[in-house]
Amino acid sequence: MPLNEMVSVVTNLVERGYIRKKSVVSALLSVPRHKFVPKYLESSAYQDNPLEIGYGQTISAIHMVGIMCEELDLDKGQNVLEIGTGSGYHAAVVLEIIGKSGKLTTIERVFELFNSAKENLLKFGYNNIEVIYGDGTKGHIENAPYDRIYLTAAGKKVPEILFEQLNDGGILLAPVGTYNQYLIKYMKINGQIYEEILLEVSFVPLIEE
């Protein structure tokens, strides 16, 4: 892995205040991003930009993955749901943070990406993950409730069923909107949902059935 390239990117993100937690820094440095992009884009893997992964989907920029991990306040042992596996890169970073005592359920709507991400994640030895092919907007009740839920694609609103699958005290993070999108942090406290608008973003649209 071109560690020096990622060190440079992560150092810059820390200096700019995007990343504060040591666990997020360590996770970003541990996951070889170039292994989660198409071969012809491997040389661009450590540029802090979104990259095409085919089928109209992208891998998020490094700073966005870092910001989302920070805002989710991830910790070891948590039960996490990811909507939109993509190439599996974001999932790998999350798995590094929640550790072997944690559990990640991730759902991908594009069959080809589901297949390649599952193969890739298992190849790197992650065995506390369940990769599911299907409509992520329905969540996955079988592994609920979740301590953390995050979406890697934007919809007009967050499906209510996802809030139902969120633990009390849990956090849900999602890009919301169509042309103008915002990353919104939802917190479930005593059964009530509170939201905080974090920043303007640009994500691919959420695919629904």
Curated annotation (Swiss-Prot):
Gene Ontology MF terms in the entry: protein-L-isoaspartate (D-aspartate) O-methyltransferase activity
Cellular component GO terms held in the UniProt record: cytoplasm
Keywords: Cytoplasm, Methyltransferase, S-adenosyl-L-methionine, Transferase
S-adenosyl-L-methionine found in the keyword field: yes
Places the protein is found: Cytoplasm
One GO BP annotation of this record: protein repair
Record-linked SUPFAM superfamilies: S-adenosyl-L-methionine-dependent methyltransferases
Enzyme nomenclature, EC number: 2.1.1.77
Catalytic activity: [protein]-L-isoaspartate + S-adenosyl-L-methionine = [protein]-L-isoaspartate alpha-methyl ester + S-adenosyl-L-homocysteine
Domain of life of the source: Archaea
Location, primary (coarse class): cytoplasm
Pfam assignment, any one: PCMT
Top EC category: transferase
Positions of the catalytic residues: S60
Job description of the protein: Catalyzes the methyl esterification of L-isoaspartyl residues in peptides and proteins that result from spontaneous decomposition of normal L-aspartyl and L-asparaginyl residues. It plays a role in the repair and/or degradation of damaged proteins.
Family: Belongs to the methyltransferase superfamily. L-isoaspartyl/D-aspartyl protein methyltransferase family.
Protein name stated in the entry: Protein-L-isoaspartate O-methyltransferase
The organism of origin for this protein: Methanococcus vannielii (strain ATCC 35089 / DSM 1224 / JCM 13029 / OCM 148 / SB)
Gene: pcm
